[in-house]
Every structure is written in C-alpha cells, then in structure tokens.
Regions:
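OB-fold ssDNA-binding interfaces and closely related basic DNA-contact patches used
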Residues: 1-146, 198-200, 272, 276, ...
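Short amphipathic beta-strand/extended segments with alternating polar/hydrophobic composition
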Residues: 84-93, 151-157, 219-220
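Generic alpha-helix signal with a bias toward terminal, lower-confidence helices
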Residues: 86-88, 164-166, 197-199, 219-221, ...
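Extended serine/threonine-enriched, polar tracts that run as long, contiguous segments within proteins
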Residues: 128-216
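Generic structural signal of hydrophobic/aromatic residues within well-ordered alpha-helices
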Residues: 165-168, 172, 218-222, 238, ...
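Generic surface-pattern signal
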Residues: 170, 174-178, 210-212, 223-227, ...
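Primarily single-stranded nucleic-acid-binding OB-fold modules
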Residues: 178, 184, 260, 264-267, ...
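Eukaryotic intrinsically disordered, low-complexity regulatory regions
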Residues: 217-283
Length: 300
C-alpha cells in the first residue's frame, strides 16, 4: 500500500443541507432546510443530483416533497470509522490542510514536514484565531444495497451535527452489542432556535432508528442479519480492521483535491455573518413544524 495516502471509504455521492450559489460575483454557501443527495459531478448550476434524491423525495411524507429523512446503513461497527471528526485548519488560498487535531494533540505542516504539537482546541490556539480552525466532520453511510461498500458522505463543520451523530453512533453501538452495521437507521433533519441564532431556526443532522421501528425490534433484526452474514462467511471485524489501517496510512485524511471545495463550502469568509449550522428565516418554521411534531410523537 502507498504510504502517505489515506485509504477512505469509496464515495458515490454527497449528502448536504445547503449549496453553493453565486452572489455579487462570488461563490458563497446558501443554507437550506432539507437534504439534497448529489453525485460527484458538477456543472454550471452546481452539483448534479443523484438519482436516489428523486426516488427518496417522491416518498417524502410532506406535500412539497422536502427530503428531511434518509434511510441509511452503517458500513462499520466501530462508530469512529463511520464518523471522522477533527479540528481542522485549511489554507484559504490553496485548500491545503495545514493542521488537524483532536483537542489533545495535532498534526501540523511545518518547515520539516508534518510535526506533532499539543492541540488546545480552537478557542485557545493562537494559530486558530479569527475562526480559521473549525471542527470538520465526515459521516460515511451506505444508501444503496447493491453496493455494500459504496458510501455517501455528509460533511459538516457544525457542532450540533457532529456532537449528536457521535453520541447516537456510540449509543446504538453499545446498546446493540457491537452490531451497529446491522441496525436499520435513518438520517433525520432537526431544528432548534438559540440566542446565538437570534431565535431563527438552525438545522442539524440526527441519526435515529427508521420510522416505526423500536430499539428492541431493531436489535432482534440486527442479530438475525449478523448471524446470516457470518453463515455466508462475511467477516465484519476484519473489515473494521482494514478500514482503521487505511485511515491511519497518512497524517491527513483530506486530500488536496477536495480541500478547495471544503474551504468554499465551510470556511468561506462570506459565511461569517451566517450561522455555521443551517439557519433560515422564521418563515420556514411552519414548513418544518409537522416534521418536528412527528419526531415528538414518535418519542412519546
């Protein structure tokens, strides 16, 4: 295997809750209140939608076919293999990742190559002042059963999404007895208002069981799937092991070819006046109210 090249899950497409638009001659992020599933191809209008976007949108329970939940499957049992997250500082001009840390230690490009330094988190790091460093998370998920190892990637710099996804993955992993990859899950878009958002709703991504499935039934189903897979010779532990090795094959997981896209979407100076989570006007509140009420009813 080539050293210095991070081996990450094969990506078939992207899941986002926003898009890049042109305003005043500049390309800036525009937030949204729904999911969009795209391919990895761009044209003059932006990312080309993946066929799965239209298929899932047609099944959406709301009248305007806004996609606010997506059925998904995790590829790995280890939560940290499905969700990757670090504090990340990019060069705004080249898109090159300069520093990546976990709050304790970091890998940083220096005069002598990649150097190891303490990571005090962005609030306390002199290199990160001015919002240059943010948490950057990538969730790898499977949407298409015809390609068991193909993934769609959800990228975010939002604390709410990263924190919620990390918690859910660990809880489901523990509750199912290390059968995370066998659970029937779905991505769910949620909204809340805070003082920081000036009481307008901000949107973040949650991970839940599929609608109509309780935890006991999900675990029972996961055990059956696990037994069938083992009987067929499938070795999940080996898959997790190889994935862990692949991630660790390089100092930085993010390649230079995708760095500029990440900077444009998440580290854009024009977006400082916006919330780094998905925020919208109060006019959108009524539009998502039914979805939020359904979530509450499901919990009750």
């Amino acid at each position: 295997m080539i050293k210095g090249l991070a081996i990450t899950p094969p990506v078939l497409g992207r899941i986002s809750i926003g898009k890049i638009v042109e305003k005043n001659g500049k390309r800036v992020p525009e937030k949204d209140d729904q999911f969009t599933i795209t391919s990895q191809i761009q044209n003059k209008d932006g990312w080309v939608k993946h066929p799965l976007d239209e298929q899932l949108r047609a099944k959406a329970p709301n009248q305007n076919q806004k996609l606010r939940s997506i059925p998904v499957r995790m590829i790995f049992n280890d939560p940290e293999l499905n969700l990757r997250a670090e504090y990340s500082l990019f060069d705004r001009q080249t898109g090159r990742l300069i520093c990546s840390g976990d709050g304790e230690s970091c890998q940083r490009l220096g005069q002598n190559g990649v150097e190891q330094h303490p990571c005090p988190s962005p609030n306390l790091c002199p290199l990160a002042q001015g919002g240059l460093c943010k948490p950057y998370g990538r969730l790898y998920i499977n949407l298409d059963e015809s390609d068991e190892f193909g993934t769609f990637i959800f990228r975010t710099t939002g604390f709410n999404s990263i924190r919620t996804l990390a918690a859910r993955l660990r809880y489901y992993h523990a509750a199912s007895g290390d059968l995370l990859s066998c659970l029937p899950l779905q991505l769910t878009l949620r909204g809340k208002s805070t003082t920081q958002s000036y009481r307008t709703p901000i949107y973040y991504v949650d991970l839940t069981l599929k609608d109509g499935v309780n935890l006991n039934d999900a675990i029972t189903s996961a055990k059956q799937i696990d037994e069938q897979s083992k009987a067929a010779g499938f070795y999940q532990e080996a898959l997790d092991y190889v994935a862990r090795q692949g991630y660790g094959n390089a100092s930085f997981e993010v390649g230079g070819d995708e760095g500029l896209d990440i900077v444009e979407e998440f580290y854009n100076d024009e977006s400082k006046s916006q919330q780094h989570e998905q925020s919208h006007n109060l006019t959108h509140v009524q539009d998502i109210q039914k979805g939020l009420q359904q979530s509450v009813q499901a919990l009750n």
